[in-house]
Amino acid sequence: MIKFRRFPYKHNLAFIIFIGILLSIINALWAFLLSIAETENGNFVVVSLSMALGFLIIPLSLFLLKHKRIYLNYYAIATGIAFGVANAVLISIFSYRDSVVVYSLITPTIIIFVLMDMLINKTKIKKRNAIKFLFGGMIATIGFVLLAFNSLNLSLITTYDVVIAIFLIVIYGMASFLLTQTGLKSKSNYSSITTIAIFEIITMLLFIPFSGYGFSFAGLQFSFIAGLIVSIGMIIGFLGYNSIQKSSHAIAYSSIMYILSEMETVFLVIFYSIFVERLSVFAFFSIMLIIIAVWYLSKESDTAFH
């Protein structure tokens, strides 16, 4: 079994970048499988719960094997609740919107992540350099917005789509920040991940009255596998968080890891463009801006944080 706190890549930027890119691939596969599950099943709560159960199995099993007590982590509880709400809403719209379109609409979550980082960790970010941190987040945000223009037909976007997109941008940005704080402060990784999964399930149960009462097993194998995959991704992500715990680079490097993990939209757009032959110059500009944001944050990590 992996010993998290003895992992050798201490404060290694290359390792953080590798983890971020790996997470983006995992997230892309997760979104693809969930969109299939919702299309085949149609009941977003059933699909959400199936995914959450798949997410729970691996960390819970590893936690029970270690026979350690549960550490009550309020960040983990808040993370589970936030992801429960966000994922339930996201899955509910997969039945009538292409997953690429949905992800393109909600890509600017990084700006919420950065703003929360600045608010919660304001004592750890040098005041005179806070604007630099925000600037790095804005570069990445612009990159993701440009990426959205590659796959969206704006004439088909409704006011309802915009409202839902804004809600998901805020809630996913908050959830991702809370997840990062959970990883950076965690005393027991499997306990924290298990707590997230349990509270995600509890939150999703609250959506049952909005789902109707039809039940079907159709497509649930895809959502369950998606849950298994994302649990592996979260365990891998905690390797990254643990490698920078108590480091002066923690804020910048965790932001870099999050920015890169959000690049699943890049993979979804490229995959989508292969079939519709619609890969515009926006996609290349967006990727370049994301790379620049990563470089800028890594460069400023030596001066802007303490």
Q: PLM features: residue spans?
A:
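Helix-helix packing/entry segments at the starts of transmembrane helices
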Residues: 49, 88, 101-108, 183-199, ...
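Hydrophobic transmembrane alpha-helices of multi-pass small-molecule transport proteins
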Residues: 1, 128-151, 281-301
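Specific transmembrane alpha-helical segments of multi-pass solute transporters/efflux pumps
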Residues: 26-29, 33, 69-101, 140-142, ...
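Hydrophobic/small/kink-forming positions within alpha-helical transmembrane segments
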Residues: 24, 28, 32, 80, ...
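Cytoplasmic-side transmembrane-helix entry/capping segments in multi-pass membrane proteins
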Residues: 17-20, 71-81, 127-140, 161, ...
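Hydrophobic alpha-helical transmembrane segments of multi-pass integral membrane proteins
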Residues: 15-22, 41-63, 135-142, 163, ...
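Glycine-/small-residue-enriched transmembrane alpha-helix faces in small-molecule transporters
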Residues: 1-46, 81, 85, 89, ...
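C-terminal transmembrane-helix exit sites in multi-pass transporters
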Residues: 109-133, 263-285
